[in-house]
Amino acid sequence: MIIKNQLIFVNFYVILIIWWFVMGILDKIQKKSEKIEKEKKSETVIPSDTKLKPIEPHPTINKKATVGNDETILDTYSIKIDEIEMEVVIKREEGYIYYLVPEIDKINMSLSKLTKDHLNHIKSQISDLGLIEYDQIREYLTNFSMRYNLAIPYIDSLAKFFYLVIGRLGLLEVPLNDDRLEEVMVNGYNVPVFVFHRKHQMCETNIVLDRNEVDRIIESIANLVNRPIDSRVPMLDAFLPDGSRVNATTADITMNGATLTIRKFSKNPLTVIDLINFGTLDIDTAAFLWQAVEGYFGAKPANTLIAGGTGSGKTTLLNVLSLFSMYNERIITIEDTPELQIPHKHVIKMVTRPARPGMPEYEVTMDDLIKNALRMRPDRIFVGEVRGKEAHSLLVAMNTGHDGALAYDEPIYLSDGNIINIGEFVDKFFKKYKNSIKKEDNGFGWIDIGNENIYIKSFNKLSLIIEDKRILRVWRKKYSGKLIKITTKNRREITLTHDHPVYISKTGEVLEINAEMVKVGDYIYIPKNNTINLDEVIKVETVDYNGHIYDLTVEDNHTYIAGKNEGFAVSNCSGTLHANSADEAILRLTSPPMNVPKIMLTALNFIINQQRIRRAGKTIRRILGIVEIVKGGGEGHEFAKTTLYEYNGLKDSLERRGICMWEEEVCEIAGITKEELLRDRENRKKVLSYLYKNNIRKLENVSDYIMRYQVDPEKLLRSIR
């Protein structure tokens, strides 16, 4: 009886254990099922047939890179994206050029073996397990395929796909990491991505993104740059951390779906040697521009404007020319997109800032930056692109070059023999034209008085003689603070602001410096009859001042004679512009919204016209002409144009045309003959030829040779013979 009861108890205990074990398993299964269901609900589905959808109009582009009768392989190379590499094939077929990623075929075949549930589970697990390395993802996929008995044909390719999709921008990472590309363009949903290749130009890719993927990428970029983009703010314009510029739109304003355009920031910018290789310009023209931009060792740098249409390579040329600046100059760059890469030591890079919705004060325009840059004592200003009123500020900078002014009681010497205090002279016009006063951000007000035809004694820095020049503007602003007072051995005196330029002699050259840099013992230029002479500075002091300070704008020379006891000679930046010719550039500058007075264009030395043209079935970039702006063009004309270089389409080359007045001016200032200037240009051609023949084209290397020439030309020439 006891035994029977024990057996019954034992049986009951065994049944209880079995029941507990079974219920535990069922509970685990239920929890696992709930977890999977939760993952399915929270995870974004990535359908394999949308991200890599074949391109219907040209189905051959999704094939592997094989050459048929009607197709030609133009290029093949690999793109490294952190831990992985992706092959790229450039193919021409029936007049189209395609940028193909052959790995997409393998990825398609592998994804076709997976269901949406598989995809969701894989993504969830990779994220939850923190698998960020390619080898980790590959190992996980290998185990996954074995566990579920899946015949995945290309595990390596599938691992690359998930490596790019999770935490990155998907297959768009391939063109974004290709340094040979200038631009990546997503034109909407379920359409091919296009790219602009430096060598092969516009190409259609076999990368097609669906709505979810395009929106995800744009949202990721917006979060990265901390900028909104939605139905209320349907456009985004910002910079990626690497300097690339991104523009995005939502489907609210673009009919084919959201768009994305990324202008890539080049890690290896083109140099003058690259442009010579491309045929954009030749060695002779390059040597001329080197000499002009540098100004023959800084004697007279040329103010230069680059004009051209969209995609003509204006900014690339500007970056190339910027390398020719003297190695020790203070350079300020002003751009919408930070593209200029100048390897000099003393460079300040400034970028505009667009307004935000409801925050117009957040905007910083190019005009704002130019005006601010002028207060930063730059030797050079490079402006990325001129579109509006900043053109006026830029030309004012070229014409005046400073914010300095004189004290009220400083005499000025008019051409009719009258000597009058500058304050009295200027105040008269401020009273006469009180309704025509224009204001600048630096506090100055000014009035145009060119129609008054009042002439003043002016110092010609080239001929070193005194000339009669017309006063174009009068300037005035309120000031309280310290002024500089300079006294010479012959008792000449002048009191002016610290930043007003005067002229001293140094090693036989005319040197323009600010008043605060004048030292006792310097020899300063003074007028004597109708020529110029030197007087020794015996005293430089600061004095307190409270009242208005004054200045003039004088045509041509931009100098005038001012100061007590017969006075002193006192004084009064490159950019790109959308235009298809020098004439169109001038028309745009002098028309709304730029409205630059024609008289101010004489501050420009050269206009370079660069365009994108079609030749032998290819799009190429060429300098089509270099025009010089010279003062005076006959009666009723403020300036004249001389074509120095002109493109010959038959020969595909630039040919020298007219006589260059800048060459005459720089010879006068530098104290050299025309033969010496041309001999120096030949030497520069030797340097460029050496770099070209030896394929020395990297930015840092080309810049080093230019700097070495500027420091010691003969030493460099000996080293390359």
From Swiss-Prot:
Looking at the UniProt entry, the stretches that span the membrane are 6-26
Q: Gene Ontology terms, cellular component aspect?
A: membrane
Keyword field: ATP-binding, Autocatalytic cleavage, Membrane, Nucleotide-binding, Protein splicing, Transmembrane, Transmembrane helix
Domain of life, per UniProt, equals Archaea
Report the Pfam families cross-referenced here.
Intein_splicing (PF14890), T2SSE (PF00437)
SMART domains registered for this protein in UniProt:
HintC (SM00305), HintN (SM00306)
Membrane topology of this protein = Single-pass membrane protein
Keyword field contains Protease = no
GO molecular function list: ATP binding; ATP hydrolysis activity
Q: Where in the cell is it found?
A: Membrane
- Write down the CDD domains for this protein, in alphabetical order: Hint, VirB11-like_ATPase
PROSITE patterns reported for this sequence: INTEIN_C_TER, INTEIN_N_TER
Q: Where does ATP bind?
A: 308-315
Q: Which GO terms describe its biological process?
A: intein-mediated protein splicing
Post-translational modifications reported in the UniProt record:
This protein undergoes a protein self splicing that involves a post-translational excision of the intervening region (intein) followed by peptide ligation.
> Which protein family is it in?
Belongs to the GSP E family.
Recorded protein name is: Uncharacterized protein MJ0781
**Origin species:** Methanocaldococcus jannaschii (strain ATCC 43067 / DSM 2661 / JAL-1 / JCM 10045 / NBRC 100440)
